Structures are given as structure tokens and as C-alpha cells.
Amino acid sequence: MQHTSSDTLSENSIKLLQITDTHLFASDEGSLLSVKTLQSFQAVVEQVMARHVEFDYLLATGDISQDHSAASYQRFADGIAPLEKACFWLPGNHDYKPNMSSVLPSPQITTPEQVELNAHWQLILLDSQVVGVPHGRLSDQQLLMLEHHLQASPEKNTLILLHHHPLLVGSAWLDQHTLKDAEAFWQIVERFPMVKGIVCGHVHQDMNVMHKGIRVMATPSTCVQFKPKSDDFALDTVSPGWRELTLHANGEITTQVQRLASGSFLPDFTSSGY
């Protein structure tokens, strides 16, 4: 499935806004580790609007829901409506794809494999979900699809989206739940120098590193944050956030993480897991 943006293909840079790991519930009182996830999600959307953040597309990189309910996905769809931008989403390990599909067709949300953003850039969206387990894996079909789109547009700078982290983050408990076939993934992408960036969710923290000449980014959750470099499960004191990216015509990526005010939506630090 290929998606061409409905806007005139711009010759200029593309601005993207990534939100991830919203962990929503059917109930508006649903909480994860004592953080009411609908409220924290809404606070992020409200702050994006209050700051007049300019962006062309919204990226939602999985774990939209915590309870698998159709209502939780509708809450997400309703929540992003004020942003008035097209949203591309993909599943995480907590998502239930039949209920994700229940809100489609949507005026904002689509689930393409590939998006031509403009004359210079494409997105490729991968499904790394393995039903019933927290780690990720790319099926042979997903790997073939990735290779196909890279071969079909060898001149386009490419940003790849998936839920699970394709690089270890240095937290033993989280790195058990990484992308299990990362080697097969990297064997494909490193053959294509136009792959400029990879964006994921899952780890509930900021990561921005270069690997094999490719920028690899993970992004804070809109709710609970995991403490970096912690061997055992641990929560961080930093606030929920989002990522802003600019894809430049020359293939460069500039990006920054933004957060809610310090002290916003603090979790239960006595929790030993979830």
C-alpha cells in the first residue's frame, strides 16, 4: 500500500511531529503507574498547540492503547483532531490491530506502508509487533516490503518508522524486548545510503545516536518515562514529551525533544514493573 500526500508535493523541508506510547484506556480515568494517560496525552496536544508548533504530518509509533479497547483508539483519534494534520500510525506490542482498524477510515489517520512526503523524502512504516509478547520482530513480508520500497525509490531520502528499538539502549530489562531480528533489518538498510533516519517508540525515553551513518531516534512517551541506563525496571523523573523533526531537502535531519513542564504527571516510583 502506497500513500501520496494529498498536498502539493513541496520542494521545501518537511516538518514532522512524533508522539508515541500514549497507552490510552477506554476509561478517561485509566492510569499507568498512577499516571492518567488520557490527561497526559491531552496535555501534550494542548502544549503543542499552545507553542504553535509547525508541522506537516503527525507520526504515532505504537502503544496507542493499554487496554486493547476500540474506545481507546477512538480517544486517540478524538485527541489529535484539534491538530488538524494527517497522522500515520503503526502498532506497538500493547496494541490490538483489529481494534486499531475499528476507527478507520478516519479523516486524519491512515496506516500506509510508504508515504511520498515530497520530491526529496519518503517514509516507510514497519509493523514490528509479535502478538502476545513485548519484544519485536519483522516478518519476512515486512523485510521484503522494506527492501522493495528502498529499491523502488533509490533517489529518495528515507525515514523509517517502527515501534521497537533496533539498537540496544543500555537498559538490560528493556533490551530484552528489543527488535529481535535487528541484524536482518540492518543488513537491508545499510545497503541503501539514502536511508537517513530511523524513528521508534517503545523505550519511553530520548535516544538520538548515529549508527552505520544513520540517525536512530527514540522518543519519550506522552505518559510514563523509563530511566535510561537502568539494568532493572526504573522510572524517570522527567516529564512526558514529544519529538519534532525537520527533514531537509539535502537529506539532513534536525530534531529536538520537547517536554511538558518539569514535575508534570509524575508516576508511582515504588512500582516494580507494569
Swiss-Prot record:
Domain of life assignment: Bacteria
Induction: Positively regulated by the cAMP-CRP complex.
Binding site for Fe cation 1: D21, H23, D63, H204
Keyword terms of this UniProt record: cAMP, Hydrolase, Iron, Metal-binding, Nucleotide-binding
Keyword Transport tagged: no
Catalytic activity: 3',5'-cyclic AMP + H2O = AMP + H(+)
Residues holding Fe cation 2: D63, N93, H163, H202
CDD domains: MPP_GpdQ
One Pfam short name: Metallophos
Cofactor note: Binds 2 Fe(2+) ions per subunit.
Function (record text): Hydrolyzes cAMP to 5'-AMP. Plays an important regulatory role in modulating the intracellular concentration of cAMP, thereby influencing cAMP-dependent processes.
Xref: PANTHER family: CYCLIC NUCLEOTIDE PHOSPHODIESTERASE CBUA0032-RELATED, PHOSPHOHYDROLASE
Protein name stated in the entry: 3',5'-cyclic adenosine monophosphate phosphodiesterase CpdA
Organism annotation: Vibrio vulnificus (strain CMCP6)
